[in-house]
UniProtKB/Swiss-Prot annotation:
Protein known as: NF-kappa-B essential modulator
Phenotypic consequence of residue 312 to A: Abolishes linear polyubiquitin-binding, no effect on 'Lys-63'-linked polyubiquitin-binding and impairs NF-kappa-B activation
Post-translational modification: Phosphorylation at Ser-68 attenuates aminoterminal homodimerization.
One Pfam entry name: CC2-LZ
Gene Ontology CC: cytoplasm; IkappaB kinase complex; mitotic spindle; nucleus; spindle pole; ubiquitin ligase complex
């Protein structure tokens, strides 16, 4: 039970004696251990001195034992403290050992993880090399497409210049018609002397001319509206081009192709409108040669022609502005042509490295916005159709030529 039996023995050794009897016992024990035999010799004269000396020796022995006992206690406490410190150090070393074991296990797991990451990186490097080869092939095909698009762009510019020349010729004819209107003013006095039937006929023909003017105005307004829609579609195309220039080179080329096709269609529509205006100008010329008009009506007609000429000059300015925008777009396209290859390749590489790959951007939004602009242009609110109605019998004619024939027959 007791871990230190020697400690109990020491405590028994340091118990103080109770009295002279005990001293005598101790003296007997000391004599048995080898003390001189003269202490036990009975002597009446030497007994008090001997007893006093024994007591002093006993006291000295007690002091020595007490000091020895105190030293032993201090030594025992030091040993206990040392044992406690050794136990704490052992626990600390065990804790450090457990931490070191956990650290070794964690480092082993990290080593396995790094090894798997290294293998994954090698696989990705192989994929990147394959992608680089594919990008080189795509670069050659894109260069060929850009060359073909530049040729188409030059062809469309030549067509635009031809349309501008035709428009200038048409304006010259309009000025000639205005000169004829001034000549008709001098004939106004003679025309006022004619028969009342001729006056009615002139009024009917005047109404037909006004209807033709309304048609021409509507055609001009339609042309302005189409030009505004074309300009809006052009701005929309430019925005789509600017937003998708970094995502896909093929989409840019497709947008430019659609834009060139739209410009060609617009030029064809302009050419048809110019031909129609030429025919109407010829009809007006015939009408002005055969049917005189009142001065007020001639002034109105002249003012309308001047307004139309002013409007056409504005249209010319707008077309020149669009031509400048087209040239600026071509210059920007040439500047961005080289940078787009690198940006597209970097973007594709970045998309392949993300954890959740995003679907590639398709050129559908640009085409959709372009076709939406065209559909909005085609589905614009319809204008009010011209009223080809006979003022005498209220006959509703389908077109201006039919109305003129009917009016002549109705008057006769």
């Amino acid at each position: 039970m007791n871990k230190h039996p020697w400690k109990n023995q020491l405590s028994e050794m340091v118990q103080p004696s109770g009295g002279p009897a005990e001293d005598q016992d101790m003296l007997g024990e000391e004599s048995s251990l080898g003390k001189p035999a003269m202490l036990h010799l009975p002597s009446e004269q030497g007994t008090p001195e001997t007893l006093q000396r024994c007591l002093e020796e006993n006291q000295e022995l007690r002091d020595a034992i007490r000091q020895s006992n105190q030293m032993l206690r201090e030594r025992c406490e030091e040993l206990l403290h040392f044992q406690v410190s050794q136990r704490e150090e052992k626990e600390f070393l065990m804790c450090k050992f457990q931490e070191a074991r956990k650290l070794v296990e964690r480092l082993s797991l990290e080593k396995l993880d790094l090894r798997s990451q290294r293998e994954q990186a090698l696989k990705e490097l192989e994929q990147l090399k394959k992608c680089q080869q594919q990008m080189a092939e795509d670069k050659a095909s894109v260069k060929a497409q850009v060359t073909s698009l530049l040729g188409e762009l030059q062809e469309s510019q030549s067509r635009l210049e031809a349309a501008t020349k035709d428009r200038q010729a048409l304006e010259g004819r309009i000025r000639a018609v205005s000169e004829q209107v001034r000549q008709l003013e001098s004939e106004r006095e003679v025309l006022q002397q004619q028969h009342s039937v001729q006056v009615d006929q002139l009024r009917m023909q005047n109404q037909s001319v006004e209807a033709a003017l309304r048609m021409e105005r509507q055609a001009a307004s339609e042309e302005k509206r189409k030009l505004a829609q074309l300009q809006a579609a052009y701005h929309q195309l430019f925005q789509d081009y600017d937003s998708h220039i970094k995502s896909s080179k093929g989409m840019q080329l497709e947008d430019l192709r659609q834009q060139l096709q739209q410009a060609e269609e617009a030029l064809v529509a302009k050419q048809e409108l110019i031909d129609k205006l030429k025919e109407e100008a010829e009809q007006h010329k015939i009408v002005m040669e055969t049917v005189p008009v009142l001065k007020a009506q001639a002034d109105i007609y002249k003012a309308d022609f001047q307004a139309e000429r002013h409007a056409r000059e504005k249209l010319v300015e707008k077309k020149e502005y669009l031509q400048e925008q087209l040239e600026q777009l071509q210059r920007e396209f040439n500047k961005l042509k080289v940078g787009c290859h690198e940006s597209a390749r970097i973007e594709d590489m970045r998309k392949r490295h993300v954890e959740t790959p995003q679907p590639p951007l398709l050129p559908a939004p640009a085409h959709h916005s372009f076709h939406l602009a065209l559909s909005n242009q085609r589905r614009s609110p319809p204008e009010e159709p011209p009223d080809f109605c006979c003022p005498k019998c209220q006959y509703q004619a389908p077109d201006m030529d039919t109305l003129q024939i009917h009016v002549m027959e109705c008057i006769e």
